[in-house]
């Protein structure tokens, strides 16, 4: 029998892959960051699409303190979600807002790197830095 975490991740992955809107997920995954991270990792492990970069979140110090985190958190950016200039994005009545973000397109060598990634060597793995939006 599947756990709530597995059922929720299955629903999210299916919705992502089919580009569908679903009912809200259980609030335990939106109220507690550790639960949200578990769900994110499980969902990302089930999506077998090319990852081209990562999106950082929770980068503001007040937000980090509010959530009692030690560092910002991140999520994968998939190739299918990277749109060229002039493309459109679907929104509906459930859309709460659009947030301006910064994203980094990561070189493929990053994913096969065996060494430690540090602040001094991270720039060699970044192809582009760009503005991006997040539909909330």
For each feature predicted by the language model, list its residue ranges.
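Catalytic-core "active-site belt" of small-molecule-metabolizing enzymes
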Residues: 2-136
């Amino acid at each position: 029998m599947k756990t709530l975490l597995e059922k929720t991740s299955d629903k999210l992955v299916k919705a992502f892959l089919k580009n569908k809107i679903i009912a809200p997920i259980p609030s335990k995954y939106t109220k507690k960051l550790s639960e949200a991270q578990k769900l994110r990792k499980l969902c990302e492990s089930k999506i077998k699409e090319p990852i081209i970069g990562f999106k950082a979140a929770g980068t503001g110090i007040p937000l980090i303190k509010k959530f009692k985190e030690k560092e910002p958190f991140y999520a994968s950016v998939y190739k299918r979600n990277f749109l060229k200039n002039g493309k459109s994005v679907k929104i509906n009545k459930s859309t709460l807002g659009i947030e301006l973000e910064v994203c980094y397109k990561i070189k493929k060598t990053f994913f096969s790197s065996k060494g430690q990634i540090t602040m001094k060597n991270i720039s060699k793995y970044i192809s582009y830095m760009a503005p991006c939006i997040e539909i909330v």
